[in-house]
């Protein structure tokens, strides 16, 4: 059974996409529109990682329709859209700087629907949302990790390669966004329709490194 993965980002078109929609913030409302071209390329590079050696059905929730920021309400609308389309996993290589009730409620609905959520989080520093919400798998970049390697930095916080790959090329850019993409890539290597707690256990067992990244050399756990 193939995973159905909702990518909430800037990407609006992919061969693997079974549905796509754009969520645009207007005064006092969120408009659902036809998805368009990726204005930044970020979401497309994330999609390259998610679909690398994986057969997945993508749902594209385009919340970055320009090079500017998105809103918590737009992300929440995209999450609800993904739930309605029976996403197994929602991937968010993004983080908002403040808690928003509308976003917290949407995340709660996704968790109640047994949808796994993977969201980018900084390895250090202030919390970001939706990664800070209970039940969300937090993911970040870890320079110790090569592509497809994982670290367990803390309970429920996983690190992975901090670089994005696109069309056979590797970019030095990425950080937490790239790490989150590689964590989702690891999740969808396993069977679909599994509980989030089982996914966390599987990621923890797979981790090559345990504990926070240090500036000194690290020894793998296995």
What are these regions (language model features)?
Residues 1, 7, 88, 192-222:
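C-terminal subdomain of the subtilisin-like protease fold in secreted/lumenal serine endopeptidases
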Residues 1-2, 70-91, 100-115, 125-140, ...:
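Mature extracellular/periplasmic domains of secretome proteins
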Residues 1-56, 167, 211-216:
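Active-site core segment of subtilase-fold serine proteases
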Residues 9-14, 128-192:
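Extracellular S/T/G-rich loop segment that most often corresponds to the catalytic His/Ser-adjacent loop
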Residues 11-13, 94-97, 123:
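Short glycine-rich anion-binding loops that position phosphate/pyrophosphate groups of nucleotides
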Residues 32-96, 206-210:
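Subtilisin-like peptidase catalytic core
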Residues 32-44, 122, 170-183:
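Gly/Ser-rich catalytic serine loop of serine hydrolases
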Residues 59, 116-118:
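Structural detector of well-ordered beta-strand residues that form the stable sheet scaffold
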């Amino acid at each position: 059974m193939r995973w159905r993965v909702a990518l909430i980002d800037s990407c609006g078109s992919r061969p693997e996409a079974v549905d796509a929609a754009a969520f645009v913030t207007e005064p006092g409302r969120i408009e659902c529109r036809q998805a368009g071209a990726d204005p930044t390329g970020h979401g497309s590079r994330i999609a390259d990682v998610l679909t690398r050696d994986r057969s997945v059905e993508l749902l594209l929730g385009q919340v970055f329709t320009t090079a500017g920021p998105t809103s918590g309400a737009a992300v929440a609308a995209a999450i609800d859209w993904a739930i309605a389309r029976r996403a197994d996993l929602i991937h968010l290589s993004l983080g908002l700087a403040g808690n928003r009730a509308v976003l917290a409620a949407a995340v709660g609905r996704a968790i109640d629907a047994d949808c796994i959520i993977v969201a980018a989080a900084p390895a250090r520093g202030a919390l970001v949302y939706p990664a800070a919400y209970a039940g969300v798998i937090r993911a970040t970049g870890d320079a110790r990790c090569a592509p497809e390697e994982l670290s367990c930095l803390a309970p429920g916080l996983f690190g992975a390669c901090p670089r994005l790959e696109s069309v056979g090329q590797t970019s030095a850019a990425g950080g937490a966004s790239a790490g989150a993409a590689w964590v989702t890539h690891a999740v969808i290597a396993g069977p679909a329709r599994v509980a989030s707690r089982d996914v966390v256990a599987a990621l923890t067992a797979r981790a090559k490194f345990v504990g926070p990244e240090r500036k000194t050399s690290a020894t793998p756990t296995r």
